[in-house]
């Protein structure tokens, strides 16, 4: 069991590294003048065929087709919220803040998922856990310190818009994912995590073609480098990281400590985005109070991961909810 747990934690850490591509490559595309609409649309247009390649080994296509045909508008609506609107907000914000700041702010999604629970559930999951909320408060304080220090305590209009966009994305992502998961519970349709991600990616395609049409109208065709970087996000974050994380949680789903450690590896995204942004984009690493805020975010995520993992272990429904908030 120890070897399995160590392997799962290693896979989760590697998954966090690949998830970091979202922040770093989005920032690279924005810094190079790539239009945010192309960056967002290309990511999910390219994620679809990449996920299709691995689907035969992840439960197959047939269950997904049946689920989409049975309730097409449910999938369309929640995929538009949880994937399209989420990604538009996160990608647009990359033009106004370094990768580490976007990554750190997006960690608000862990408390967003808790705050949304009373709106989504009508059972014991609607309860707001006090200890988890306290740790979420640590994350919020850390994000506030990072934002305030980076912008020298004076957020201009663009900074406020960027902060609002990332915060909105942090709520839209768990809202869309958990709503689909709740729909599957009620309909009795059994899809694994990869099938759900593929289904939402497929269902969101009409929106992405509209976004691509808008991008083509206002910015022309994307540069080859932007297409390449968007493909990197699709491959790294949309495919590899997703599969690695699901594999890690599956290996230790009945081990509270190990599952918590796996979830806590999410905190490494902030560290990886700082290192990669500094090394490859020439960004300035957080210093002083900004660094202290980043440390608070990491502490909050690690603590929350350990707490949530302990409470979710052995509970199939809770573990599925935990896994549903990753993989975009």
Sequence positions of predicted segments:
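Glycine-/small-residue-enriched transmembrane alpha-helix faces in small-molecule transporters
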Residues: 1-42, 134-144, 152-185, 203-211, ...
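Cytoplasmic-side transmembrane-helix entry/capping segments in multi-pass membrane proteins
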Residues: 8-13, 68-78, 126-140, 190-199, ...
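Hydrophobic/aromatic residues within transmembrane alpha-helices
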Residues: 29, 39, 43, 93-94, ...
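Transmembrane alpha-helices of multi-pass small-molecule transport proteins
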Residues: 32-85, 112-116, 168-179, 196-216, ...
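Helix-helix packing/entry segments at the starts of transmembrane helices
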Residues: 16, 42, 102-108, 184-203, ...
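C-terminal transmembrane-helix exit sites in multi-pass transporters
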Residues: 109-134, 252-253, 258-261, 268-291
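Hydrophobic transmembrane alpha-helices of multi-pass small-molecule transport proteins
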Residues: 51, 118, 128-150, 287-308
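Specific transmembrane alpha-helical segments of multi-pass solute transporters/efflux pumps
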Residues: 18-21, 59-106, 145, 236-253
């Amino acid at each position: 069991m120890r070897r399995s747990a160590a392997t799962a934690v290693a896979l989760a850490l590697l998954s966090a590294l690949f998830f970091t591509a979202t922040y770093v490559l989005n920032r690279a595309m924005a810094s190079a003048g790539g239009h945010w609409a192309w960056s967002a649309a290309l990511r999910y247009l390219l994620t679809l065929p990449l996920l299709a390649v691995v689907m035969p080994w992840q439960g197959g296509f047939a269950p997904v087709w049946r689920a989409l045909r049975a309730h097409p508008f449910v999938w369309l609506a929640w995929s538009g919220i949880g994937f399209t609107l989420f990604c538009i907000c996160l990608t647009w914000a990359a033009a106004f803040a370094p990768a580490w700041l976007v990554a750190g702010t997006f960690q608000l999604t862990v408390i967003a998922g808790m705050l949304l629970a009373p709106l989504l559930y009508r059972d014991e999951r609607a309860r707001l856990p006090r200890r988890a909320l306290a740790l979420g408060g640590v994350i919020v304080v850390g994000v506030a310190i990072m934002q305030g220090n980076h912008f020298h305590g004076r957020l201009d209009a663009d900074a406020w818009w960027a902060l609002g966009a990332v915060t909105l994305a942090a709520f839209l992502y768990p809202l869309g994912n958990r709503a689909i998961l709740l729909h599957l519970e009620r309909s009795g349709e059994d899809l694994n995590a990869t099938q759900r991600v593929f289904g939402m990616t497929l269902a969101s395609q009409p929106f992405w073609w509209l976004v691509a049409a808008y991008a083509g109208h206002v910015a022309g065709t994307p540069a080859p480098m932007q297409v390449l970087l968007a493909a990197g996000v699709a491959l790294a974050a949309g495919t590899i990281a997703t599969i690695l994380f699901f594999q890690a949680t599956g290996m230790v789903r009945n081990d509270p400590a190990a599952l918590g450690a796996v979830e806590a590896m999410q905190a490494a995204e902030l560290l990886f985005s700082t290192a990669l942004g500094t090394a490859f984009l020439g960004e300035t690493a957080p210093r002083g109070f900004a660094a202290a805020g980043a440390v608070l975010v990491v502490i909050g995520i690690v603590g929350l991961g350990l707490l949530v993992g302990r409470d979710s272990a052995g509970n199939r429904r809770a573990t599925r909810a935990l896994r549903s908030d990753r993989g975009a």
